[in-house]
């Protein structure tokens, strides 16, 4: 059954003549005003390569929708470029931007009575922000990822942006020269597009396919590929079928679809940020998803894709062997996916994967068989315990450490921790604690890549890190994030002291502060929250509305 259209009540009939007058002013004809009016929401910005080309992609998407008999109008959303904000106040706006993007798309869509939605994203928060809006609106919707950059090269080594961050630590430790750092900087990100490894942007692009909200194979072509343009146009055309058949986003974004996405995340060893984002998208879709679902699926799902930072390959490599569908098909054949879920093609996941054209090339060096995994368990594990009663996240795909016990080195901000690593305060065997960097505390739950890269770059291979902040998808090593409750609301991480023993136990799924329950209670009684860092403006508003990381750090009405 065709979807019920919003636009006729706004643009048809005598009383809507003023509205039509404005549509004529932007070039629409009587015939075009009579067609379904669809939105092209594009996350476009010139402040970084990830979304620089998104406006051009929007024009291509418009062509596709016109071929499908629709009338498209495009609008931009905001973009916060994570890499440019890294290690600065700018990173506090990153996660905030996810929810702002969702709000912006909702406002534009409803204010102008659109009938369907094409979303175009790139950098880390744009994909989840747009998918959250699609889930919230529950209208015919389809997503297309803008694509990753091609990898860089220096002295025979393939580079990603991760290498630049770690090169700073290597330079400070006098392991490389300033000129070598400069050459790495110049060569690491040679084209438009998102970071080339399976960091957060490529992880979420992959999730759009796994959820069934994007065309099969559309996540992996680079931003510079002609196939990227083809997929964008086909995405626009596909929206016509969704409207014609009345398929809305929540018919696709079911609990089973989220299980498929989590399974894919675990198999690919994707970014820990996807845990936050899938929880948030599920919240907007009215689907009850919890951290326990992630661990349940992680236990049964092997890690099979050798993708940076945990492995050896980048998104362009995965594209050459068939893209995300190669991973999905292996999981489906092993009985690990729900093949009967509906997707934006109007077909089931199983039908899509059976009809997909896989290149006839070897792929086992990148994507292994389920029976011969890189690791028997999925790439992300949820930890709980006396230090994180509501949960914390570790990316086991990017570390071989399964148990770590060490003395705490406590910092109350990322900046203090970075200075501490720089000055040699951190010693092998210690656990760096960075607190008051959670959703409410920072606010905005910034990523700690500057610190983790400094640790790795300095050659501190036996140091762990625990934080109520986040990590970049480029982070590797024994790093635990998303600790909940966060320090700002009185979580146990707030009362850790230098020299306390911290235990990270992946096999037992535990994160513990080695103190008696009585001592923890007594310290919490003595604790009082610090003054908020922001008392006005966007970040202050956000801090008053945001939930804990264990709930996806979504903003909710006060």
From Swiss-Prot:
Cofactor(s) demanded: [2Fe-2S] cluster; Mg(2+)
Pathway: Amino-acid biosynthesis; L-isoleucine biosynthesis; L-isoleucine from 2-oxobutanoate: step 3/4; Amino-acid biosynthesis; L-valine biosynthesis; L-valine from pyruvate: step 3/4
EC number: 4.2.1.9
Record-linked InterPro entries: DHAD_IlvD/Edd (IPR050165), Dihydro-acid_dehy_C (IPR042096), DihydroxyA_deHydtase (IPR004404), DiOHA_6PGluconate_deHydtase_CS (IPR020558), ILV_EDD_C (IPR056740), ILV_EDD_N (IPR000581), IlvD/EDD_N (IPR037237)
Keywords: 2Fe-2S, Amino-acid biosynthesis, Branched-chain amino acid biosynthesis, Iron, Iron-sulfur, Lyase, Magnesium, Metal-binding
Residues noted as binding [2Fe-2S] cluster in the record, renumbered to the chain: 50, 123, 195
Catalytic activity reported: (2R)-2,3-dihydroxy-3-methylbutanoate = 3-methyl-2-oxobutanoate + H2O; (2R,3R)-2,3-dihydroxy-3-methylpentanoate = (S)-3-methyl-2-oxopentanoate + H2O
NCBIfam families reported in the protein's UniProt record: ilvD, PRK00911.1
Entry protein name: Dihydroxy-acid dehydratase
Lineage per the UniProt record: Archaea, Thermoproteota, Thermoprotei, Sulfolobales, Sulfolobaceae
């Amino acid at each position: 059954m065709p979807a019920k259209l919003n636009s006729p009540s706004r643009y048809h009939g005598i009383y809507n003549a003023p509205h039509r007058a404005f549509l004529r002013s932007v070039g629409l004809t009587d015939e075009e005003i009579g067609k379904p009016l669809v939105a092209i929401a594009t996350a476009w910005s010139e402040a970084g390569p990830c979304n620089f080309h998104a406006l051009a992609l929007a024009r291509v998407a418009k062509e596709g929708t016109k071929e499908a008999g629709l009338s498209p109008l495009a609008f931009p959303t905001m973009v916060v470029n994570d890499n440019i904000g890294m290690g600065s106040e700018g990173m506090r706006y990153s996660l905030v931007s996810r929810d702002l993007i969702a709000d912006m798309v909702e406002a534009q869509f409803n204010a102008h009575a659109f009938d369907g939605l094409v979303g175009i994203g790139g950098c880390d928060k744009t994909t989840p922000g747009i998918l959250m809006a699609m889930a919230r609106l529950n209208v015919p919707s389809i997503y297309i990822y803008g694509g990753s950059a091609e990898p860089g090269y220096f002295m025979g080594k393939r580079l990603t942006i991760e290498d630049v961050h770690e090169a700073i630590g290597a330079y400070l430790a006098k392991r490389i020269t300033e000129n070598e750092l400069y050459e790495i900087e110049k060569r690491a990100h040679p084209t438009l597009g998102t970071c080339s490894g399976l960091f957060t942007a490529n992880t979420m692009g992959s999730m759009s396919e796994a959820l069934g909200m994007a065309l099969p194979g559309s996540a992996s072509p680079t931003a510079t590929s002609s196939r990227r343009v083809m997929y964008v146009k086909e995405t626009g055309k596909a929206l016509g079928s969704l409207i014609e058949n009345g398929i809305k986003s929540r018919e696709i974004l079911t609990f089973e679809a989220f299980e498929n996405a989590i399974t894919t995340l675990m198999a690919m060893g994707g970014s820990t940020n996807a845990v936050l984002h899938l929880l948030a998208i599920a919240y907007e879709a009215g689907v009850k998803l919890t951290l326990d679902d992630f661990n349940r699926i992680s236990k049964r799902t092997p890690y099979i894709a050798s993708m940076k930072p945990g492995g050896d390959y980048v998104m362009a490599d995965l594209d050459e062997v068939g893209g995300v569908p190669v991973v999905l098909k292996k999981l489906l054949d092993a009985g690990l996916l729900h093949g009967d879920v509906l997707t934006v093609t109007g077909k089931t996941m199983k039908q899509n994967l059976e009809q997909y054209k896989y290149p006839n090339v070897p792929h086992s060096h990148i994507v292994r068989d389920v029976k011969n995994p890189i690791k028997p368990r999925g790439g992300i594990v949820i930890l709980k315990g006396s230090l994180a009663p509501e949960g914390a996240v570790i990316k086991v795909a990017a570390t071989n450490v399964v148990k770590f016990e060490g003395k705490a080195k406590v910092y109350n901000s990322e900046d203090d921790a970075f200075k501490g690593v720089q000055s040699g305060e951190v010693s092998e065997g210690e656990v760096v604690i960075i607190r008051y960097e959670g959703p409410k505390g920072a606010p905005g739950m910034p990523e700690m890549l500057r610190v983790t890269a400094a640790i790795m770059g300095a050659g501190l291979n036996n140091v762990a890190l625990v934080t109520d902040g986040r990590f970049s998808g480029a982070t590797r090593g024994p790093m635990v994030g998303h600790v909940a409750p966060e320090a700002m609301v009185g979580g146990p991480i707030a009362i850790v002291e230098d020299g306390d023993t911290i235990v990270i136990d992946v096999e037992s799924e535990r994160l513990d502060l080695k103190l008696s329950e009585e001592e923890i209670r007594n310290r919490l009684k003595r604790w009082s929250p610090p003054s908020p860092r922001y008392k006005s403006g966007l970040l202050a508003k956000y801090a008053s509305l945001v939930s804990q990381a264990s709930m996806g750090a979504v903003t909710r009405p006060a």
